[in-house]
Structures are given as structure tokens and as C-alpha cells.
């Protein structure tokens, strides 16, 4: 059906709704790209339909929910010669891109360890997530967390550090171990929203994942959407000659010789890596390696 945006006929748009409305949208021959921003479980079926109909696809994270779906998207993209892009916005944050450029130019030496996270207290948002119907009291996201264990939203933290470590550009993830706390807040949320006792809430309030790569690098990823604390994606790179950190304090740590080797002249005589470099040096480094 057509709806007016209030500014005349020129702003009329065709609206496709319902569980399968996207199928009709994907059949149109005047659309080049389908942008998918639904609940997680609908990302894959909408993307699959779009690719099968010859459309380029841009998918909010996560792009798929299991390995089978991941490979199917790869195969469909290659078969139909259409782009299929995961929209991991955190890879394109200014600090991350600036720091990636530094890492690729050897400012930190060899990056051997990296940290990333999605730590975001969703207390103000749980009640606003889409619900399937009147009987759905939890909303899609809380329901998914209740049914699944582990880091269910890893790419905000993982994407930027994977780039810095050249994952699939000379290295690969090889070994993974994850550990979580018990669920306390999750169970309380079910009781609060569904008015029933929750005996099983699979997602721990805080999950920590350690990954070792084939080249001996280590990645630590954290996930916590339950407990009260400041928003934090960590983003930390540990190199053999330098250090970068975004949350909670943005800064770089290099000694004087490494800063000189990176093309920036220190303004202080005793610059070392025991603390973040002074603002003047940091500004000069950042400007030199603008992405």
C-alpha cells in the first residue's frame, strides 16, 4: 500500500509489511540493494530472498545465526554475483580506523593481543523490542538471550580487533574458550516482564571469550547487556612496541624512540610507555595517521 510522508505525492512510498512482505519487495526490478534491520532471526531469510532475486544486500549484525547460514550467504553472493555486506558499524568508528592505520604501518610493532567488547546495559530498552504478538511478554531480544548461551552479540568488539590482527589476511582464529557468570539479572527480567519465575536463563550476565590464533595472537571478547555499568567496547591493542586503548580512556603509549620511528618528534625528553602520551604528541600521531 502507498502512504504519504506528509510532503506531497513526491514522497509517497510503497510499504511492504507482515511476515512475508519482504518477498514481494525483493521481486521488484527497480531495487538495487536491500538494507536489513529487523530482529536477528529475520536477517538471514530476508538476505537469502534478496540475493536469490538478484539484489545486493546490506545486513545489520549479526548477518546470520549459525555456520550453515553463513556459508549459504557466501554461496548465494558468489553464485548471483551480488554484494552481501555485514554492517558492522564499529569497524568504521573514527578511533578504530585511525588506530588500524597505525597498526598497519607498524606503529605498535607486532600486535600480539587485542580486546573488544559489547558492554551495554539494555535496561531502558528491553520493553521496546518487537514482540511477536499479545502473548509475547519478553520481546525478541530478551527471549533470544534466555534461550542461548555464550556471546550472542560478538561483532561490535570482534570486528575492529580482527582487522588489526589481520584475521583472514594471513592469520585465522584457531582455539576458543568461553566462560560466563550465572544469570541473575536475566532471570529477574523474565519475572518482571512475564510475571513468571524463570528457572532457566541460558545467557550469563557476563560472558568472556578467549581466542588464540594460528600465529599465536590472543583475542579477548566480553559481552554484558545486563548489569549497570558505563557503555564499553574496550578496543585495546597490545603490540611489541606500543599500546592503544579506547574505553574508558582514549590514548596511546609509545616510548620516545618508537614515536620518532613513527614519524612524530616527541616534545618531552622522558617520554615512555608507562602512561598515555601527552595530548600534543597524541594529536600529532593521530593527524599523521588519519585514515
Please report, for each region that a protein language model flagged, where it lies by residue.
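Single conserved hydrophobic/aromatic residue that forms the stacking wall/gate
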Residues: 1-11
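A structured beta-alpha segment of the ubiquitous adenosine-cofactor-binding alpha/beta core
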Residues: 13-31
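Non-transmembrane alpha-helical segments in soluble domains
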Residues: 23-26, 47-51, 74, 100, ...
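Predominantly a Rossmann-like dinucleotide-binding segment in NAD(P)-dependent oxidoreductases
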Residues: 83-85, 90-201
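Glycine-rich phosphate/pyrophosphate-binding beta-alpha loops
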Residues: 221-232
Amino acid at each position: 500500500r502507498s502512504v504519504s510522508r506528509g510532503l506531497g505525492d513526491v514522497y509517497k512510498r510503497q510499504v511492504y509489511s507482515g511476515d512475508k512482505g519482504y518477498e514481494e519487495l525483493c521481486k521488484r526490478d527497480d531495487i538495487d540493494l536491500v538494507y536489513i534491520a529487523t530482529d536477528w532471526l529475520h536477517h538471514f531469510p530476508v538476505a537469502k530472498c534478496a540475493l536469490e532475486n538478484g539484489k545486493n544486500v546490506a545486513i545489520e549484525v549479526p548477518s546470520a545465526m549459525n555456520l550453515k547460514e553463513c556459508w549459504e550467504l557466501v554461496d548465494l553472493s558468489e553464485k548471483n554475483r551480488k554484494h552481501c555486506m555485514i554492517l558492522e558499524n564499529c569497524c568504521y568508528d573514527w578511533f578504530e580506523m585511525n588506530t588500524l592505520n597505525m597498526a598497519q604501518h607498524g606503529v605498535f610493532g607486532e600486535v600480539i593481543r587485542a580486546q573488544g567488547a559489547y558492554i551495554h546495559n539494555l535496561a531502558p530498552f528491553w520493553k521496546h523490542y518487537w514482540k511477536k504478538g499479545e502473548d509475547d511478554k519478553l520481546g525478541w531480544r530478551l527471549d533470544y538471550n534466555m534461550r542461548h548461551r555464550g556471546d550472542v552479540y560478538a561483532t561490535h568488539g570482534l570486528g575492529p580487533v580482527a582487522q588489526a590482527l589481520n584475521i583472514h589476511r594471513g592469520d585465522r582464529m584457531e582455539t576458543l574458550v568461553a566462560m560466563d557468570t550465572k544469570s541473575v539479572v536475566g532471570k529477574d527480567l523474565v519475572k518482571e516482564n512475564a510475571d513468571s519465575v524463570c528457572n532457566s536463563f541460558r545467557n550469563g550476565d557476563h560472558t568472556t571469550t578467549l581466542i588464540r590464533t594460528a600465529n599465536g595472537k590472543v583475542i579477548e571478547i566480553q559481552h554484558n547487556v545486563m548489569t549497570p555499568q558505563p557503555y564499553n567496547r574496550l578496543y585495546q591493542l597490545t603490540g611489541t612496541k606500543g599500546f592503544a586503548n579506547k574505553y574508558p580512556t582514549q590514548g596511546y603509549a609509545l616510548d620516545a624512540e618508537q614515536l620518532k620511528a613513527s614519524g612524530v618528534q616527541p616534545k618531552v625528553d622522558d617520554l615512555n610507555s608507562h602512561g598515555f602520551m601527552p595530548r600534543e604528541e597524541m594529536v600529532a600521531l593521530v593527524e599523521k595517521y588519519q585514515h
